[in-house]
Amino acid sequence: MTLRYLTAGESHGPALVAIAEGFPAGLPVDFEAVDRDLRRRQKGYGRGGRMKIETDAAQFLAGLRGGVTTGAPIALAVWNKDHENWKDLVSPYARGGRKFTQVRPGHADLAGALKYGLDDARDVLERASARSTAVIVALGALAKALLSSQGVEVCSRVVAIGPRDIRPDAPPTPAQRDAIEASDLHVDDEALAAEWRALIDAEKARGGSIGGAFDVYATGLPIGLGSHVHPDRRLDARLAGALCGVQAIRAVEIGDGTQVGRPGYEFHDAIHHDPARGFWRETNRAGGLEGGMTDGMPLRVRAYMKPIPTMLHPLATVDLATRAATQARYERSDVCAVPAAAVVGEAVVAWELANALLEKFGGDTVEDVRRAVEAYAARIR
């Protein structure tokens, strides 16, 4: 069975909840590792006041016993502390408070309200909020655990804030990963981080916001995850879709995908083989994916995040109730959330990779998966 999940919950509701199905039995789950990823999502220079209220932690409700998966569906919740401050406005049992009609450009407010016949965009923005990514990160931590059990590791790095970017061509080393995790901008270059902080400070001072980009990497992937036979089975398409499903992500690049001005001999990766290493490449311009499948090299995927559209200096809009011109309503938000988005990016990439791994190797238990992976590795060497 492959993986699937369903989530529910609103930004200021009681909790965000999820049910995940398809994890093999026998997978140890490090609860602290799950909560550590949730804390990582809350970090980052430029975050707003909400992160000072929440102390995110996952509560597992089903599907594990003694910290190990049983093969049954996994249920979990991430509780919203801030709900106490909003319970009179956002409640499953009553409606109250001022209606949200000054819809914000760049958000789901207008289209969602019109689509569902709503006179209050609150019902749209509560679900559309990036707060929902907290439970996605918890699910992603489970996917990371499954991948790690088979020798696959996932990490990320912020590579752009505003116009100032970098283009590393390899996953970070262990020392670089330590520096990235210690950085409030999720990067291993403190001089660059200082430049980025200045850009964020400037946008905050003028009531604006700023976007950027991040890379997600995966190492240890076997050749052949994904498929070339149908568009919806191509792993590059699935990864791009998963990343574009994250709030504010507007573009995705696989490997050196945007560098199409190069001639072919500078764009593709020559193939080599030796008995000890198997198939290998000197370069990784493809970012670990060819023909919709992993090629054995590290995965490198870049996601581009737009500036958050909720700003203290708002754009012009139209009031949903009166159709009169007005200013977009301000709702507590971040100036920059690219470091947090990188952690969410890890989660959705890990989920797609774990899904592809189980599609390829199956298995009702983690040991079944391990044996299938080892047999396949021996066959293709």
Curated annotation (Swiss-Prot):
Pathway(s) annotated for this protein in UniProt: Metabolic intermediate biosynthesis; chorismate biosynthesis; chorismate from D-erythrose 4-phosphate and phosphoenolpyruvate: step 7/7
Which GO biological process categories is it annotated with?
Answer: amino acid biosynthetic process; aromatic amino acid family biosynthetic process; chorismate biosynthetic process
The record, for InterPro entries, names: Chorismate_synth (IPR000453), Chorismate_synth_AroC_sf (IPR035904), Chorismate_synthase_CS (IPR020541)
Offer an example of a GO molecular function term for this protein. Answer: FMN binding
- Any idea of its EC number? 4.2.3.5
Q: What does this protein do?
A: This reaction introduces a second double bond into the aromatic ring system.
What name is this protein filed under? Answer: Chorismate synthase
Gene name? Answer: aroC
